[in-house]
A protein has these predicted regions:
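Long, contiguous binding/interaction regions
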Residues: 1-60, 66-89
Length: 89
């Protein structure tokens, strides 16, 4: 599977700013009904925090976990993109 130019640029920037393995923070905003799908991406990860929005329609999900490469970071974002309504921050 080939990566898009924007994915390649993102991976290059990650490699320039991180030494692997390292702790990386993922942050998502997701409709409340889809929260578990995002949580499932991080079931064996180091640290996971959730916080509901003011009116309870959305959930903020923050995960800090050890990743071994920019490819692993991109894979998480690509998996999260499959969740309907997710916003990756």
């Amino acid at each position: 599977m080939s990566s898009s130019p924007s994915t390649q640029q993102f991976k290059q920037r990650l490699d320039e700013h991180h030494q692997w393995p390292c702790t990386y923070m993922f942050k998502f905003i997701v409709p409340l009904q889809q929260t578990q799908k995002i949580l499932d991406l991080f079931e064996s990860r180091d640290e996971l925090h959730t916080r509901p929005s003011r009116y309870g329609r959305y959930m903020s999900v923050t995960a800090r976990c050890t990743v071994s490469s920019s490819d692993e970071v991109v894979a998480v974002y690509q998996a999260a993109a499959q969740v309907q309504g997710v916003i990756s921050l």
